[in-house]
Amino acid sequence: MTHFIFVTGGVVSSLGKGISAASVAALLEARGLKVTMVKMDPYINVDPGTMSPFQHGEVFVTEDGAETDLDLGYYERFLRRAKMTKLNNFTSGRVYQDVLNKERRGDYLGGTVQVIPHITDNIKERVLAAGEGYDVAIVEIGGTVGDIESLPFMESVRQLMVELGHKRTMLMHLTLLPYIRSAAELKTKPTQHSVKELLSIGIQPDILICRTEHDVDADTKRKIALFTNVEARAVVVCKDAKTIYQIPRNFYEQKVDDLICERFGYNDLPQADLSDWDQVCEALFNPEYIVRVAMVGKYVELPDAYKSVNEALLHAGIQNRVKVQIDYVDAETLETQDISILSTADAILVPGGFGERGTEGKMLAIKYAREQGIPFLGICLGMQLAVIEYARNVAGLAEATSTEFNRSTKFPIIGLITEWLDERGELQQRSVESDLGGTMRLGAQKSELVEGTKTRQVYGKAEIVERHRHRYEMNDRFIEPIEKAGMKISGYSTAQHLVETVEIPEHPWFIAVQFHPEFTSSPRDGHPLFASFIDAAKKQHLKTK
């Protein structure tokens, strides 16, 4: 029997609902419960797959190929025993699309289709399906209480709390306690009004997570409890922390997990062992060195566009006991600036992306890393550009490019793949006319690493499984001239022998991959590719120190 914790936010957005929810999930998992998480997004897009990173940040890809909200990345990084799937994230657009398709098929037998019950029932069905087979499902509702877009979701939550009952549901509400400097005082009124908004919908919160920059005394907590109908011990203070990985310990010390276990009847569980989280924080706060990684991209003004890459570098720093300082370099400005701005970097990374804009700047950075012997990691488009740069400047194919940038090129080193097998082994097809949404090679795919290569050495095994999100691949017609010039194809997809990884054997550390290793990195376990990359950066730092 699954228990549900619904997570809402009030006063302002960006309070950290996802991190708070993931921290609670980590606590419950540490007590032995089987936990999953769900993110409900009120926007009308079917999924974030075609949204600009400037609008939405990164698109997180699950094992089964769902293009989802970046919060699912937090969920997976905080949980060890649960992987997110297509069931764990859905939007208003997805719900309305499903309901309208049913209406067109005649499933509603000519009845009037309405928000209540048709939309709300669809939402409830999705929540219940995602929670099936778990002890606890933590369900985050995107946006802020009172937003018009989120009303169907809030009504669905209200109905579920009534239908499932008090002993199977809880609501955790995040709110802001602003500090007024002129009065030297924390203000509780925004929290009171936020809860009032919830109550007007018919929902009473059970736990309040109060975000603040300052300590909160017992009197203030009692005042909040009095005016919100919440127990004083359920008013949880979430003061700004040095790292998000301190939040599980913070919640543990305020007995958030005890509150939940009491409510759900989990009275005989062992206490949570958070020693692994303590080790993560200890390594973060006591680095031996600082290494600088230049990340060359076109969305660098918004770090959330590369959230999982940023986190994977942080995790690799933990593994190597170094602090990773990321220097964001705009690829377009690099085309007009002196390339020597990269001279302070201990390593260079070119992440994934789409489109031609900024590609010349990225290739300048790749060439610099290759010629100067600086550790380089290319991801997705970063791999494709590494191959193009090598083809142009080493293999003698001066006009080499991708058909993404020039469909009529005579040297299509990178081309559109028209057929591939999905994660279920089923044939998928596309063409240049296909819709952008949902037409990529997505999700976990097996690859075989070539024996004797650095990539094989880094992973420590022959077969790996990594997640993909791309339309274009290296053209196998050009493998021979590329390898003859010195670049090594070090990995191929198991199913179709597509190029997955390349490296330059004569370089200290130059690896580029078609997949997205950042999606499977975690603070407690890291990822072998990023760990090796930062180890190489550390050696580069010590060499040039």
Swiss-Prot record:
L-glutamine binds at G353, L381, G382, M383, Q384, E404, R471. HAMAP family: PyrG (MF_01227). One of its GO terms (cellular component) is cytosol. The keyword ATP-binding applies. This is CTP synthase. Mg(2+) binds at D71, E140. Keywords: ATP-binding, Glutamine amidotransferase, Ligase, Magnesium, Metal-binding, Nucleotide-binding, Pyrimidine biosynthesis. Signal peptide: none annotated. The active site is at C380, H516, E518. Its EC number is 6.3.4.2. Homotetramer. CTPSs have evolved a hybrid strategy for distinguishing between UTP and CTP. The overlapping regions of the product feedback inhibitory and substrate sites recognize a common feature in both compounds, the triphosphate moiety. To differentiate isosteric substrate and product pyrimidine rings, an additional pocket far from the expected kinase/ligase catalytic site, specifically recognizes the cytosine and ribose portions of the product inhibitor. UTP binds at S13, K187, T188, K189, P190, T191, Q192, K223. GO terms for biological process: 'de novo' CTP biosynthetic process; pyrimidine nucleobase biosynthetic process. Catalyzes the ATP-dependent amination of UTP to CTP with either L-glutamine or ammonia as the source of nitrogen. Regulates intracellular CTP levels through interactions with the four ribonucleotide triphosphates. Residues 292-543 form the Glutamine amidotransferase type-1 domain. Pathway: Pyrimidine metabolism; CTP biosynthesis via de novo pathway; CTP from UDP: step 2/2. GO terms for molecular function: ATP binding; CTP synthase activity; glutaminase activity; identical protein binding; metal ion binding. InterPro entries: Class_I_gatase-like (IPR029062), CTP_synthase (IPR004468), CTP_synthase_N (IPR017456), GATASE (IPR017926), GATase1_CTP_Synthase (IPR033828), P-loop_NTPase (IPR027417). Allosterically activated by GTP, when glutamine is the substrate; GTP has no effect on the reaction when ammonia is the substrate. The allosteric effector GTP functions by stabilizing the protein conformation that binds the tetrahedral intermediate(s) formed during glutamine hydrolysis. Inhibited by the product CTP, via allosteric rather than competitive inhibition. It catalyses: UTP + L-glutamine + ATP + H2O = CTP + L-glutamate + ADP + phosphate + 2 H(+); L-glutamine + H2O = L-glutamate + NH4(+); UTP + NH4(+) + ATP = CTP + ADP + phosphate + 2 H(+). Residues 1-266 are annotated as: Amidoligase domain. ATP binds at S14, L15, G16, K17, G18, I19, D71, K239, D240, A241. Belongs to the CTP synthase family. CTP binds at S13, D147, I148, E149, K187, T188, K189, P190, T191, Q192, K223.
